[in-house]
Amino acid sequence: ELQNSGEYKKTFIMIADAQALTDNIENPEKVRQNIIEVALDYMSCGLDPAKATIFIQSQISELCELTFYYMDLVTVARLQRNPTVKSEIQMRNFEASIPVGFFTYPISQASDITAFKATTVPVGGDQLPMIEQTREIVHKFNTVYAPVLVEPKALLPENEACQRLPGIDGNAKMSKSLGNCIYLSDSEDDVRTKN
């Protein structure tokens, strides 16, 4: 809908492979394979590469650079208060040993959003704290340096049931990394055996 609405000048769709490594560091081959699967899923949902720019996060080195600078604008205490980070840490049983890359992924997401001057970011309800944290980073950056970054707005699905899809295990959210999802490429038999 977004790519065809005419409301937005450009649409950027990211395949977040670098972020996927934050909780799959032991399995880089899985992340590599998921790049292809996610791209195919995007296109099977109707994303048109002629209308939307689909890119791979790790191929844009400037995103890492921007993340590095943004890290100085966010405190550890602020990251610890982020409700999305808290719930993700619990879901992945990282309480005792949180990988730094995983802990700081909200800062990386802020880079992913602001690098492209995104005005609108489609998210589920669980991602609202991430957008809020991005807005805080933008505000602080613009105040300290120069008013050059855009404060993005969240775009939630109109259907409230789509704002947070539960996993097939009934817990948390549906997620590839949690292994509790149905893939668009799943056969009918695969879907039945997952129930």
What are these regions (language model features)?
Residues 1-110:
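N-terminal Rossmann-like or analogous alpha/beta NTP/dinucleotide-binding catalytic cores
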Residues 86-195:
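Active-site cores that bind ATP or allylic diphosphates and position pyrophosphate for catalysis
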